[in-house]
Amino acid sequence: MEEKFRNLIEVWISALISLSYCYYISSKLSKGVLRLLSILPVCILFLVLPLFLSCVHFCAISVLFLSWLANFKLLLFAFDEGPLFPLPPKLSRFICFACLPIKIRQDPSPNAIPNLHPKPMPKWVLAVKILVLGVLLHVYEYRDGLPRFVVLALYCLHIYLEVELVLVFVGAVVSTLLGCNIEPVFNEPYLATSLQDFWSRRWNLMVSAVLRSTVHIPVQRFFKRILSPDGAMFAGVMASFFVSGLMHELLYFYMIRKPPTWEVTCFFVLHGAATATEIAVKRTQWLRPPHRAVSGLVVLTFVSVTGVWLFLAQVLRNNVHEKAIGECLLVLDLAKLFTSS
C-alpha cells in the first residue's frame, strides 16, 4: 500500500508542475494554435500518468480529474473558452478549476429553473448516504446468499454513493481552501423524471457542463450549416454521449488494462439515442406526460437495467468490483484502527 501512495504522490506532483507550466507559460501565448501546441504535451502526459496507478480508486479519480476534466478544460483554455478563462488571479485557483469537478456557486435569479441550480446537500442527507454506504460494505460479506439481482442492485447503488461522496468531499475541501461556495456535483439523480433530466440536470453535473462546452455546442454549431436546428441539436446530443462513452472506455482500460470491448460506449450511445428520442417526442406533444412517479420509475429501471447489462459488464467480468470493495473495506479497517488508538 505504501508503494501505491508513493505512486499517487508522484503522479500528482507531475500534474501540479504541468498545470503550473500552463498557468505561467501557456497563458502568456496568444490564444489559438500556438497556445494549443504548448498545451498538447501536458494533455498527452495526463493520458499517461494514470498508467502508473494500480489502485482502482486512485486510478479512477486520477483519470476523471486529469485525463478527462483537465484535458478538456485545457483544450478550451487554448481558445480562451471554458472555466479557465479569464485566467484566475492565483495559481491555486487555476489548478483547482482545471482538474477538479468544481464550479463557484452563483446566486440564481428568481425566475431560474430549480433543477438547473441545485441546492447544497443537507447535512442529514449526507449523513444518511454515508451510513447507507457503510451498511452496503458490510452487506457484501453476505452477498453469496443473496439473489443475483439484489447484488447487482447493490453494486449500482454503491457506484452512485461512492462517486457522489468522493466528489462532495473534494468540493468541501476546495470550498474551505478557496473560501467560496461550490456548486453541487449531483442533484439527487434518483428523483429524475426523464433521461434528459437525469443526464443534464442531476448526474455528475460538472462532467455534463464540460461535455456541453467541448462537444455539444461545437457539434451543434457545425451541423446547423447543413441540418435543421432540431437536427443539429440531436447531433450534439449524440456526439456528447458518444464522447462520454469513449472516455469511460478509457477509464476502464486504465483500471482493467485490457483492450476495450465497447460495451460501455454502447451504453452511452443507447442512452444518447433514447434521450434524443425522448426530446423529440416531447416536442411533438403527441403523448400526455405521465405522472412523475411513473416516469421516475421508468427512468430508474431503464438506467439500472442497461447499466448492469452494458455499463458494469467489463467491471464484473474482470472482478474490478471485488478489488474496489476490498479497498473500501481496507479504508474502514484503517479508520477503525485510527479511532481506537
UniProtKB/Swiss-Prot annotation:
The UniProt catalytic activity note for this protein reads:
a long chain fatty alcohol + a fatty acyl-CoA = a wax ester + CoA
Stated membrane topology is: Multi-pass membrane protein
Q: Which UniProt keywords apply?
A: Acyltransferase, Lipid biosynthesis, Lipid metabolism, Membrane, Transferase, Transmembrane, Transmembrane helix
Membrane-spanning segments: 7-27, 36-56, 58-78, 120-140, 149-169, 233-253, 261-281, 293-313
Q: Does the keyword Cytoplasm apply?
A: no
Principal localization reads membrane
Q: EC number(s)? A: 2.3.1.75
Compartments, record wording: Membrane
A GO CC annotation given for this chain: membrane
**Is this entry keyworded Magnesium?**
no
Q: Which GO terms describe its biological process?
A: lipid metabolic process
- Tell me the GO molecular function terms: long-chain-alcohol O-fatty-acyltransferase activity
Report the protein's function: Catalyzes the final step in the synthesis of long-chain linear esters (waxes).
The family line of this record is: Belongs to the wax synthase family.
Instruction: State what protein this is by name.
Output: Probable long-chain-alcohol O-fatty-acyltransferase 1
Lineage of the organism: Eukaryota, Viridiplantae, Streptophyta, Embryophyta, Tracheophyta
